[in-house]
Swiss-Prot record:
PROSITE patterns per the UniProt record, alphabetical: AA_TRNA_LIGASE_I
Binding site for ATP: K641
UniProt short sequence motif 'KMSKS' region, positions renumbered to this chain: 638-642
Name of protein: Leucine--tRNA ligase
NCBIfam families: leuS_bact (TIGR00396)
GO cellular component: cytosol
Catalytic reaction list: tRNA(Leu) + L-leucine + ATP = L-leucyl-tRNA(Leu) + AMP + diphosphate
This protein's record includes keyword Nucleotide-binding: yes
Top-rank lineage group of the source organism: Bacteria
Gene: leuS
Pfam families listed in its UniProt record: Anticodon_1, tRNA-synt_1, tRNA-synt_1_2, tRNA-synt_1g
Amino acid sequence: MSTVEPNAYDPQQVETSAQQFWDATRAFQVDENSDKPKFYCLSMLPYPSGALHMGHVRNYTISDVVSRYKRMTGHNVLQPMGWDAFGLPAENAAIKNKTAPAKWTYANIEHMRAQLKSLGYAIDWSREFATCTPDYYVHEQRMFTRLMRKGLAYRRNAVVNWDPIDQTVLANEQVIDGRGWRSGALVEKREIPQWFLRITDYAQELLDGLDQLDGWPDSVKTMQRNWIGRSEGLEIQFDVRDTTGAALDPLRVFTTRPDTLMGVTFVSIAAEHPLAQHAAKSNPELASMLETLKHGGVSEAELETQEKRGMATGLTAVHPISGEEVPVWVANFVLMGYGTGAVMAVPGHDQRDFEFANKYGLPIVQVVKLREPRNDDEQAWDATQWRDWYTDKSRELELINSAEFDGLDYHGAFEALAERFERKGQGQRRINYRLRDWGVSRQRYWGCPIPVIYCAKCGAVPVPEDQLPVVLPENVEFAGTGSPIKTDPTWRQTTCPECGGPAERETDTFDTFMESSWYVARYTSPNARDMVDRRANYWMPADLYVGGIEHAILHLMYFRFYHKLMRDARLVDSDEPVTNLLTQGMVIAETFYRDADNGGKDWINPADVEIQRDERGRVVGASLIADGQPVHIGGTEKMSKSKNNGVDPQAMVAKYGADTVRLFSMFAAPPEQSLEWNEAGVDGMARFMRRLWVQVHKHVGEGAAALDVASLSAEQKAIRRKTHETIGKVDDDYGRRHSFNTAIAAVMELSNALAKFDDASAQGRAVRQEALEAMVLLLNPITPHASHALWQVLGRGETLLENVPFPQVDAAGAGA
């Protein structure tokens, strides 16, 4: 039985009592032996950085609200938690704190688990795991060896973003303005051996599958469609000659605009293209240029903004229609990793080619015109001024200056050229994708070892399954200059499993997106001997996944791909891992700073600032509490360490209680929108919690009575109608709309109406009892600790409220 004091609302006492009850009864531990419909709800698993931030709190509270609501509506609910524990931050912390990454990681997990428990989340902790343990990563090692045997995992040299400080490969998204996202070092291009998974084999299925994901935001699906980037075009062959006229290997280029072929005035190739390397052997100036371009970006986004640079190679390409020779140029906006590393340059109808041609004085030819120009600007064509219609394929176009193809539109030209090239063996129709195979190698220590052995005789050999896991040594001295396993001969040196000769282990580790690509399935059967067992097909696909939209094209793409690999390995039956996706907005807060001596800014935490606001709550002045002197107001931005505007959830829970923090995080904004942290708003939620506490205790002190609907007065009927209208709205807000802020507002309105209802008669008290019981249950998904206590105060006994049915609308009551 609860030991909560009857009158004063003490959040710490209330929350400790509820949490002890949940722990003692294993309230949220679930299994598959239920006749209830299943509901699998989870948030993206956290990285154990050392402390929760408000973004975590918002994310996990959303999941918890839905999970508790679903259990109250008769579902068998799984809400698990684990730790995405490998990764570069642990290595950096190990260097800074002079400790092993493993020790730092496990200590952080202990601390963050306690923080999560203090917030009262309805988590099945029996399924917890950390992805850095051999019990977890042995399964992805086994899967990788199977993918190797099927040809879905392979090794090749690849041009990568190389961070010379962190000594690792960076994804394109980790390169910001040409520098490493973490170290700030100038990124280089390097060609090194890398392991890849053939995600491109699944490109069309990944694209088609988006049409079935009705529960995913359109914005995420659009981002994935664009990232996959399906395009239909022609692959065309250009013969190549050197400076002596001798034939070299031909170039094959892919284009979605074959209608502009007669406008080709040069061909552009990537700096890493074999023809560029060949030409550089006899051209020192070109060789120097290629070396310079190593520091350029390798992402399309970077190439759109950086200055166009290039150099003629001295080679020429033969136009496949006219037979004319056009120069071959190296250009910094052509990527070796996209298509063939060569593009046909049509400066009259491609803006990048246009800018490049104007810079270097190359010919520009118009070969397409609009059939129905809308104005003089569209009638004119100027080789010195770019106009968007030059490349607008959506308009009615007509070929000009294109020999026998003059007068054709886009589709007519496409078909005519495709037929010609296929007949002559000079090209073919082709579907191309922007999506590249997933490079999974990382030159780091703190990651899952790639289970491969290199033998001089046998080559790359997968580690036999009976020798898995390949365990990463955890008790290491880590200085940050390279990886400890690379310099440890006892770990690195081994014998070849095929010939028994001397061999060496792969010292690269997996990209940490590998671990987060299948963990959702592992929660369903965390103690299975294989990757998953039959329980996966009970729970999968997950019903709701909550996380940030910033993961749309990396984690969520790999996540879908890996699930299909598991399906094809007959580990799961479903095609997709998640049915519904909720992408919550950021948590933002005000920023304050003083100018630093070095010309920068010293950011000051809002907790250290005295803020003056106008009558509308806007900041009009601010001063540092420590010295009373003014500070600059920096605007409202995402909570971050760099802006020092984060709020410590632990401090907020200690000051206000977990329920109040949960309540504010759900009330301040709809889930998909940014939430502005405002402690005045938190204080307002605390006042509401105290008012509700007093409201219930005052009512109980007056005594209860049985409800007799037939004898209710008009005022009593009005309160009862308000109660049942609120039940209907909150039920819809929780279940269909995920609009938690309006659900809270509706309960507050009912509370206010009840506060004005001072009928102390027996039926007045009965109507009030029904309303208060409904309010306690309606708030339970958001404020479960207080609801747990107030349910007892209302005389209903100590029980798990998630097993109490969610209130139902009484049609007669709603229309009373």
